[in-house]
């Protein structure tokens, strides 16, 4: 297998893992490919953002902003299969109702949603809706660029958690386990490029917005390092659901950082 085909397979594996979109052509499965595909998680964020934010933007030509935002959020869930939202709900249920590592991990594996998960989803989706509406009213271009770097950087922060603490399920045989292990240095550097380039480009286009973006990164960093300690204390590591929780949380914090900064001007 040549190098180009190998990289394509890694990207396709990441595509399949993070979205419900059709399988890309010329993909050849192998576990070695799967194990290094997480380097492209932030790049998948570019694709999800492009599909949802530009659909919202074009819908706003014929529909009220609020309805366009709702439809864009629905499209995001359809593209990803609610993958990260499911992780957020499972973490809320598990840590809200569990009192030991074994019980927390058991609740996470339960496919049913409970009270804490429902509350977490309602609050996070409601906050996301309000923040996106506010960003769009500030400027459609601010909305588009913020969506781009928030989707990519939030997935990078999920990878950062993987680098900081071990996987919590020692004997897990799930198909996703090969994807959720520490990245080699080059892979993490590549994911950092895909995760941070949109923010750098945003600053290039809006050079007076450095404090806004830095606030988002600052809030997200505090969030990740707090939950690194929290997860390590209770389950001695992370699970795939923890990564979804981190992605959703940091995405919201980027939206919040830009919103706070703009409304303080």
Curated annotation (Swiss-Prot):
Major localization class: membrane
Physiological role: Joins adenosylcobinamide-GDP and alpha-ribazole to generate adenosylcobalamin (Ado-cobalamin). Also synthesizes adenosylcobalamin 5'-phosphate from adenosylcobinamide-GDP and alpha-ribazole 5'-phosphate.
The protein, known as: Adenosylcobinamide-GDP ribazoletransferase
Keyword list, A-Z: Cell inner membrane, Cell membrane, Cobalamin biosynthesis, Magnesium, Membrane, Transferase, Transmembrane, Transmembrane helix
Record's catalysed reaction(s): alpha-ribazole + adenosylcob(III)inamide-GDP = adenosylcob(III)alamin + GMP + H(+); alpha-ribazole 5'-phosphate + adenosylcob(III)inamide-GDP = adenosylcob(III)alamin 5'-phosphate + GMP + H(+)
Organism: Leptospira interrogans serogroup Icterohaemorrhagiae serovar Lai (strain 56601)
Pathway the protein takes part in: Cofactor biosynthesis; adenosylcobalamin biosynthesis; adenosylcobalamin from cob(II)yrinate a,c-diamide: step 7/7
Cofactor(s) essential for the protein: Mg(2+)
First and last residue of the signal peptide: none
């Amino acid at each position: 297998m040549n190098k180009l085909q190998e990289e394509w397979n890694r990207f396709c594996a990441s595509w399949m893992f993070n979205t419900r979109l059709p399988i890309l052509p010329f993909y050849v499965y192998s576990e070695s490919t799967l194990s290094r595909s997480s380097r492209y998680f932030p790049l998948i964020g570019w694709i999800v953002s492009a599909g949802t934010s530009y659909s919202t933007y074009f819908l706003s030509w014929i529909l009220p902003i609020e309805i366009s935002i709702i439809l864009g959020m629905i499209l995001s869930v359809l593209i990803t299969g609610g993958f990260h939202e499911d992780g957020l709900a499972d973490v809320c249920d598990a840590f809200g109702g569990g009192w030991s590592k074994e019980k927390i991990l058991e609740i996470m594996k339960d496919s049913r949603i409970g009270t804490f998960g429902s509350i977490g989803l309602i609050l996070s989706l409601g906050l996301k809706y309000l923040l996106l509406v506010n960003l769009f009213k500030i400027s459609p271009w601010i909305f588009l660029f913020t969506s781009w770097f928030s989707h990519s950087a939030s997935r990078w922060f999920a990878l950062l958690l993987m680098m900081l603490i071990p996987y919590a399920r020692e004997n897990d045989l799930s198909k996703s386990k090969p994807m959720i292990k520490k990245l080699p240095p080059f892979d993490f550097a590549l994911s950092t490029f895909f995760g941070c380039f949109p923010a750098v480009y945003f600053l290039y286009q809006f050079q007076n917005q450095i404090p806004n973006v830095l606030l988002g990164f600052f809030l997200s960093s505090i969030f990740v390092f707090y939950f690194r300690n929290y997860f390590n204390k209770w389950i001695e590591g992370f699970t795939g659901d923890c990564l979804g929780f981190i992605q959703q949380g940091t995405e919201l914090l980027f939206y919040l950082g830009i919103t706070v900064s703009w409304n303080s001007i």
